[in-house]
Amino acid sequence: MNINDNLSINSPVDNKNVVVVRARKTDTVFKAFKVAPNIWVAPERYYGESLSIDEEYKVDGGIYDSNFLSQDSEKDKFLQAIITLLKRINSTNAGEKLLSLISTAIPFPYGYIGGGYYAPNMITFGSAPKSNKKLNSLISSTIPFPYAGYRETNYLSSEDNKSFYASNIVIFGPGANIVENNTVFYKKEDAENGMGTMTEIWFQPFLTYKYDEFYIDPAIELIKCLIKSLYFLYGIKPSDDLVIPYRLRSELENIEYSQLNIVDLLVSGGIDPKFINTDPYWFTDNYFSNAKKVFEDHRNIYETEIEGNNAIGNDIKLRLKQKFRININDIWELNLNYFSKEFSIMMPDRFNNALKHFYRKQYYKIDYPENYSINGFVNGQINAQLSLSDRNQDIINKPEEIINLLNGNNVSLMRSNIYGDGLKSTVDDFYSNYKIPYNRAYEYHFNNSNDSSLDNVNIGVIDNIPEIIDVNPYKENCDKFSPVQKITSTREINTNIPWPINYLQAQNTNNEKFSLSSDFVEVVSSKDKSLVYSFLSNVMFYLDSIKDNSPIDTDKKYYLWLREIFRNYSFDITATQEINTNCGINKVVTWFGKALNILNTSDSFVEEFQNLGAISLINKKENLSMPIIESYEIPNDMLGLPLNDLNEKLFNIYSKNTAYFKKIYYNFLDQWWTQYYSQYFDLICMAKRSVLAQETLIKRIIQKKLSYLIGNSNISSDNLALMNLTTTNTLRDISNESQIAMNNVDSFLNNAAICVFESNIYPKFISFMEQCINNINIKTKEFIQKCTNINEDEKLQLINQNVFNSLDFEFLNIQNMKSLFSSETALLIKEETWPYELVLYAFKEPGNNVIGDASGKNTSIEYSKDIGLVYGINSDALYLNGSNQSISFSNDFFENGLTNSFSIYFWLRNLGKDTIKSKLIGSKEDNCGWEIYFQDTGLVFNMIDSNGNEKNIYLSDVSNNSWHYITISVDRLKEQLLIFIDDNLVANESIKEILNIYSSNIISLLSENNPSYIEGLTILNKPTTSQEVLSNYFEVLNNSYIRDSNEERLEYNKTYQLYNYVFSDKPICEVKQNNNIYLTINNTNNLNLQASKFKLLSINPNKQYVQKLDEVIISVLDNMEKYIDISEDNRLQLIDNKNNAKKMIISNDIFISNCLTLSYNGKYICLSMKDENHNWMICNNDMSKYLYLWSFK
């Protein structure tokens, strides 16, 4: 789809792409710009809301500014920002299909007859008399278009109401609250009855916020609004009252449920629908069946009355045709989770609104195109350099609760705010009142495939549909917009026991001069608020231990200090403790109790947790509500049925009961998810905020120290500049350690939630299920016993076939349930921590060799065009022939420093014999960094820091012309250097003396004097363990090994029989002919032909297993050992002299793993066509593929 980007606020009105139109039901006019067919942008505040809002109606977290978007310069920036976002959405196939569908999905037109209008659910009268027979006939037959008249509802009208412009959506600026995005319908009735109605979107493109470590992408926020617009355009909007319980909010005696609108649930996607809406769907409502019916009704009207009606323009018909190419389920399955993957956008996996209660959003400014382009954030979602908005000071502060922490004298120590989640709440227990229906069919089946629901959207066809120029307007196409305003109140709670929110607040400070303290009471009692609560015991001990030391006045002292701050922070924040439990929790985050006063403990959290169990971490511990169920009574009219008919009907009932058990199961599952897991999720969120608060404190301490040295020390400007760069990288490394801590929290609390389910919920559930099953079994047996037309044996047969003998249902299996929970709850909100910084690949194209990086880090690569490729250990390898060839990899991730751990591994085959020093790979600047080079027939790994401290490790035994797997692991936390050759640890050295190795962001792979093969060069941002080295080494080797017929590794010097793939039951034998011995299959059942015994001989005598592209000699064991040669007629023959034997290349088959190929001089060894009584082994490339395949048994 073409997005019109040739527009500005000053573009002249042309009544085509730039128009002045009237807002619905008002006298307001605005300038609108058509950016795509039926898609308009109005760079104005939304007209439907007053920009002057009384304080009591302002919502918590909102920002109100009546002057926003009032200047033409702002309006132009808004227009360009929306165009940029639409172009970004349009840049992927999925996004282009979404926009094409929105452009096409026009509301259903109204029928017109003699001054009256008709829609399937509505008729109004103009001047036509009511006795008109044709009109009455129309009404009774419900045919909307007998006379080909129609009126359209999707249009904008000019100021004088004489010109009309087709429109499906209009994107405005925000309404009164400038940080609220919204999607509103034009006409409520048509939004729900299948007719469809156009949509208005309010949108704020200039402000975003952070979620964990990444910024929310405005493109995904706009996609959310666009998806919602389809519900209005198709007329399938559900009732506003269709809500489901989302999470329990339980504080002291107050218990409320947050409720989530069904559209928000469907559109958000992610984890929530997998539990709340898992098929079969236990929560039934008429919405799904009714919406599907009105959708099908209108598609049927289109197909029968419009598609073939030549009096209706193609601009209308073709759009309706494309609109109805998709099914209603396709719309229900459009969600942000799908689009986030299509755009590689990070987003929360749970509905965003439910995350606001534990912290306050801070908004960041987005400047287009400086910070954001059609490719997204210029520096990525995590590293985007966005400034905090000045508007944060205007955020409305209306907490849901205020927690007053009082001391023993009832003096207030602190006030902490708990904010709402933006959702409606209710005190009604949905589950205790909801009756699970028995006979209702499943309302909606989710599509579990990975296929796009937009597959039926044909972009090419849609692009060629003529635009709607002449609009026949239906004047009653809209309702007056009525904004919903509500008054919110705040309740206050007094407590002497600190709540988690109190502890969380104590970890934040605005004081520039602060000190860390582990004494919470001391912190909240301090008069000047200079103390900040921290649970980082190692950090505080270190800071206390050096307070009397001499001041830091050199770069080396600063590096030593900075390194220790980093190491101690890492030890504190990533600390866990192994424990033993009966339900799978084997690791506890030790600081969790200290951070949030969980269990009201200090150092004894782990012990208390072991004593009280995982249930002790949350407030609600009551039993789940037993669902109200219906039971199916077997009708008495079945008593007289013949045996077969009776058995069939009883089996149908049996199947219905099984499905009903599933409904009960999902009801329990949903209660657990809503009432129990939601509380653990709250703890996860608060614990992560605590991690980020501690991280912020440590970073402020570091930045304060660096600022002081920059302004007050005698350190040279060059060294200060280097210290500044190094500190930036260390701050990044601190964030990485925080992410590890947050992952630990995820794992711990998710496991705790699963433990509660297994220990507290599942037994009650199974007990209830047993009651249900027993009751059904009793009724079934009683009914069968009452059947008088069958004998006792037949009754027993029916009982055995139609009663439930046990709870042996797959969906009741606890292990299956735990696997489901583990897969869906692990790492719910995480930064995508892909550890690979460089993954080198190479492959051949016709006339060109391609070298690239598969890490996804957008590495810039420059390389000599004459670098050759050869087949390596497992794929194409680089051939550096020693003629000053080079490859340069550039990426900010490659910058080293003081605290970053990293690993390097690659496969190397050294072809050189020289002893002269020859560089291989490195990252150095101003003689600082790391490097690997050849020297004295070995390999040297060198590290040198900015202060001249150096470490050199010499590695021998890599110059024997064989492949070796080189792994180098630099662990800055353990101050340890590990080096492996193949699967052997050859160096374990301390690097405590090595400080800052800051170097450029370039890694160079060189070939100065030494020819070599390099394959699989990989750089990781973490150290590598011995177990990982072994795993990597043998994984690659396993892929490269040739396999025998049993999939075992083929061995040198081991005796085998040889078979051809085509004749897999006939071994290769020896046949004498003309004083020569040739090889053939025994296809005559000649008992004198015995299977030959083969042995593979390696060129390398130390090699045990055969690998791809090895050169091999094949010997045949007879009375004396013979060797394979190739005769003049290309047959394989046996000779006595090993020196004259042919060296063949052995490889495996990609598709048949236990088969191999043999080749000589580029020709394959194959089996000939039958020659008299023989199929000879020959060297020839003209045979069928499968005749080239061999197998050793």
From Swiss-Prot:
Keywords: Disulfide bond, Virulence. Has 3 domains that are structurally very similar to those in BoNT/A; light chain (nLC, equivalent to the light chain, residues 1-408), N-heavy chain (nHN, residues 409-829) and C-heavy chain (nHC, residues 830-1193). Residues 409-829 are annotated as: N-heavy chain nHN. It comes from Clostridium botulinum. The lineage of its organism: Bacteria, Bacillati, Bacillota, Clostridia, Eubacteriales. One of its GO terms (cellular component) is extracellular region. It comes from the Bacteria. This is Non-toxic nonhemagglutinin type A. Belongs to the botulism non-toxic nonhemagglutinin family. Assembles with botulinum neurotoxin type A (BoNT/A) and protects it against pH-mediated inactivation or protease activity at pH 2.6 (the pH of the animal gastrointestinal tract) but not at pH 6.0. Necessary for neurotoxicity. The keyword Secreted does not apply. Pfam families: NTNH_C, Peptidase_M27, Toxin_BN_H, Toxin_R_bind_N. Gene3D superfamilies: 2.60.120.200, 2.80.10.50, Clostridium botulinum neurotoxin b, 'coiled-coil' domain, Metalloproteases ('zincins'), catalytic domain like. Forms a highly interlocked heterodimer with botulinum neurotoxin type A at pH 6.0 but not at pH 7.5, called the minimally functional progenitor toxin complex (M-PTC) (BoNT/A, botA). GO terms for molecular function: metalloendopeptidase activity; zinc ion binding.
